[in-house]
């Protein structure tokens, strides 16, 4: 039921609790209360793609997931948008679960001694939140948590996509994304 609600329930951007709302570097919620659904992930990921372009972040994006029930469907949704935007995505071999520090380390190692072609990352995790929750965090090229200037920008852009019924969100099928 939780995963079905992720795909079936559409957030109402006029209801504050159903909008994208970044806390500590990420957006968290549950598909049962319409605070973490596919539309949230599609909108946030497109906003990140635009942010990357505006900041000239054109290296690979490291995509990690954890063991929460909504992480795999959210990862699929994010990958469809990232691929449609031409972002090179790096994932753990065999789609293994990836803790946040592993993604941070991958970003730092990749960016070491680089001035251009920098990497960043998305981690699909609600961190310490309950099993029914999902979450998405964005790590910029410094490998750490995004500051409020970044998260506010992504949040505002994502909410504009929600308000426009995802108009402007690029997406291809998962099969094509692979």
Regions found by a protein language model. Give the residues of each.
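Gly/Ser-rich phosphate-binding catalytic loop and adjacent alpha/beta segment
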Residues: 1-178
């Amino acid at each position: 039921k939780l995963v079905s609600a992720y795909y079936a329930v559409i957030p109402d951007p006029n209801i504050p609790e159903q909008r994208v709302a970044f806390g500590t570097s990420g957006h968290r919620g549950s598909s049962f209360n319409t605070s973490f659904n596919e539309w949230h992930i599609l909108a946030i990921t497109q906003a990140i793609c635009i942010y990357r372009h505006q900041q000239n972040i054109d290296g690979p994006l490291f995509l990690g997931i954890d063991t929460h029930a909504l992480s795999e469907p959210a990862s699929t949704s994010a990958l469809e948008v990232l691929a449609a935007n031409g972002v090179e995505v790096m994932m753990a071999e065999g789609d293994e679960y990836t803790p946040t520090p592993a993604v941070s380390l991958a970003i730092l190692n990749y960016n070491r001694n680089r001035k251009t072609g920098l990497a960043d990352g998305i981690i699909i995790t609600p961190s310490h939140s309950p099993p029914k929750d999902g979450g998405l965090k964005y790590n910029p090229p410094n490998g750490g948590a995004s500051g409020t200037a970044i998260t506010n920008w992504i949040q505002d852009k994502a909410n504009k996509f929600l308000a426009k019924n995802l108009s402007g969100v690029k997406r291809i099928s998962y099969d094509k994304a692979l």
